[in-house]
């Protein structure tokens, strides 16, 4: 994976439906919210990442991985119906469907809030996946509902109402690293990960990312690990140690 710019900001902010897998004291929760859109329908990009996640779950212990996928006319991952939305979990190289939600909106505050309330824990890592929109700070698109986008107000509204504090909030999306976005997530996370430019279509390398999330016992170690990984990336910019009032 190549990101032209990776922006890492370490912020010193102290920061259940039926059959939901609960995190043990030894597990780190990773929540991935996928607005799959045409990235999945046209090229199966979300499915490729799901396959990376499934493969990685074979070798990685200590992670509770929960994925929401929706907003696409077609889903290419085995066992999923087109134009449906799902909660999935991955463990020991297998994918389990936790919830088939049918055709529901994905780019709305209440949809993200439902996901966070059902599966979130304090100190979890949250990754938001989809198309980024630069200065407008919107994540999209929901191709099932008129290409709706998750706007900044809806995102921060869901984060605030969830009453969760995350270890990391990251965007596997283009152009989501901005002062405006940083200011919005400061109250909710210790670490912000995004790029200010375009991503390649394959986005993040989840085999690598999940291994680092599993093996980093502190935000400082996670930052150092990710900095080392991307140090040779073209035009990398890394910011750490910024203190929030």
Locate the predicted segments by residue.
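Terminal, contiguous helix-loop blocks that mediate binding/assembly
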Residues: 110, 117-121, 125, 132-135, ...
């Amino acid at each position: 994976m190549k990101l032209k710019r990776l922006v890492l900001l370490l912020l010193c902010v102290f920061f259940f439906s039926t059959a939901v897998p609960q995190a043990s004291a030894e597990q780190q929760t990773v929540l991935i919210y996928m607005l799959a859109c045409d990235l999945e329908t046209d090229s199966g990009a979300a499915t490729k990442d799901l396959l990376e996640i499934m493969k990685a779950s074979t070798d990685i212990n200590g992670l509770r991985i929960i994925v929401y996928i929706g907003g696409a006319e077609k889903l290419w991952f085995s066992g999923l119906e087109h134009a449906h939305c799902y909660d999935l979990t991955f463990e020991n190289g297998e994918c389990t469907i936790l919830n088939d939600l049918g055709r529901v909106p994905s780019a709305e505050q209440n949809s993200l809030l439902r996901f966070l309330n059902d599966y979130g824990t304090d100190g979890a890592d949250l990754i938001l996946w989809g198309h980024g929109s630069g200065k407008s700070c919107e994540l999209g698109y929901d191709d099932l509902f008129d290409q709706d986008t998750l706007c900044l107000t809806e995102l921060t509204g869901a984060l605030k109402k969830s009453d969760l504090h995350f270890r990391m909030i990251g965007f596997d999306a283009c152009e989501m690293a901005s002062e405006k976005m940083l200011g919005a997530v400061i109250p909710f996370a210790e670490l912000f990960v995004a790029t200010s430019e375009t991503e390649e279509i394959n986005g993040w390398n989840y085999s690598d990312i999940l291994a680092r999330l599993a093996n980093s016992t502190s935000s400082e170690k996670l930052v150092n690990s990710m900095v080392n990984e991307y140090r040779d990336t073209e035009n990398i910019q890394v910011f750490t140690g910024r203190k929030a009032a």
